[in-house]
Curated annotation (Swiss-Prot):
Name of the protein in its database record: Rhodopsin
Pfam families from the UniProt entry: 7tm_1
Molecular function GO labels: 11-cis retinal binding; G protein-coupled photoreceptor activity
Cytoplasmic side: 33-44, 105-123, 196-223, 280-289
SUPFAM superfamilies in UniProt: Family A G protein-coupled receptor-like
Gene: rho
Keyword Transport (UniProt): no
InterPro entries named among the record's database cross-references: GPCR_opsins (IPR050125), GPCR_Rhodpsn (IPR000276), GPCR_Rhodpsn_7TM (IPR017452), Opsin (IPR001760), Retinal_BS (IPR027430), Rhodopsin (IPR000732)
UniProt source species: Paracottus knerii (Stone sculpin)
Chief location category: membrane
Marked site positions, Plays an important role in the conformation switch to the active conformation: 84
Length: 289
């Protein structure tokens, strides 16, 4: 044991709680949306994509971590580590790029930079494909030799190896690629879209260009997506910050808890998206009841 057995027991209990909550709420989101035709809108396709991403994390990552925490180390070998790291990375990245697509959709629908543009089912499907392709370009490289997945923190889950700088894995280039393409760029797009969106909402309200009902509906949807983005940042920014600090301070000593806490706090992202969707979408709640 790297830390006390009680810490592994607490970790296992925490993962069990995430599975107990994360699987039902994400499955419920998928089931209710697919069951009720009026919920099958282009925007909701992207929200369904978030639920699928969260289920990847729950089924492919959380169950594995709960099992390994009972043993005090990662007992599933190289293949198990690759699979767990892949599913966790893929799920987190699909969620991030889905939020990018949602931000662009909100900007186009509210800001109207393209006249007479409607966000249709085809656009939503393109957005889904885009999110999966971009997520794969982050999750697949460690499987084929550009960096690798290794047990991290308390050695109960696997993530990308950004701290050993082992020879032959081009650690520096992948970490710079990951932080630039899969963190800074998507967040910059999100902040740009919502910055422009806030300006558009204020201008429309001042000019009374649209009916009050339409404005209220667009504001509610935009507020829901903004809260999802804030939730993503709250969950993943500590992990990204610690990972970057470790990468930039090679040789510095840090304990297993230092890396474990932000990594497992980030996993709560599999719960908050469906809860936000359920709590802030009246139409969904009515269909669910």
């Amino acid at each position: 044991y790297l830390v006390s057995p009680a810490a592994y027991a607490a970790l296992g209990a925490y993962m069990f709680l995430l599975i107990l909550v994360g699987f039902p709420v994400n499955f419920l989101t998928l089931y209710v949306t697919l069951e009720h035709k009026k919920l099958r809108t282009p925007l909701n396709y992207i929200l369904l994509n978030l639920a699928v991403a969260d289920l990847f994390m729950v089924l492919g990552g959380f169950t594995t971590t709960m099992y390994t925490s009972m043993h005090g180390y990662f007992v599933l070998g190289r293949l198990g580590c690759n699979l767990e790291g892949f599913f966790a990375t893929l799920g987190g990245e699909i969620a991030l790029w889905s939020l990018v697509v949602l931000a662009i959709e909100r900007w186009i629908v509210v800001r109207k930079p393209i006249s007479n543009f409607r966000f249709t089912e085809d656009h939503a499907i393109m957005g889904l494909g885009f999110s999966w392709v971009m997520a794969s370009t982050c999750a697949v490289p460690p499987l084929v030799g550009w960096l690798r997945y290794i047990p991290e923190g308390m050695q109960c889950s696997c993530g990308v190896d950004y701290y050993t700088r082992a020879e032959g894995f081009n650690t520096e280039s992948f970490v710079l690629y990951m932080f630039t393409v899969h963190f800074l760029i998507p967040l910059s797009v999100i902040f740009f879209c919502y910055g422009r969106l806030l300006c558009a909402v204020k201008e429309a309200a001042a000019a009374q260009q649209e009916s009050e009902t339409t404005q209220r509906a667009e504001k509610e949807v935009s507020r829901m997506v903004v809260i999802m983005v804030i939730g993503y940042l709250v969950c993943w920014l500590p992990y990204a910050s610690v990972a970057w600090w470790i990468f930039c301070n090679q040789g510095s000593e840090f304990g297993p808890i230092f890396m474990t806490l932000p990594a497992f706090f980030a996993k709560t992202s599999a719960i908050y998206n469906p809860l936000i969707y359920i709590c802030m979408n009246k139409q969904f709640r009515h269909c669910m009841i």
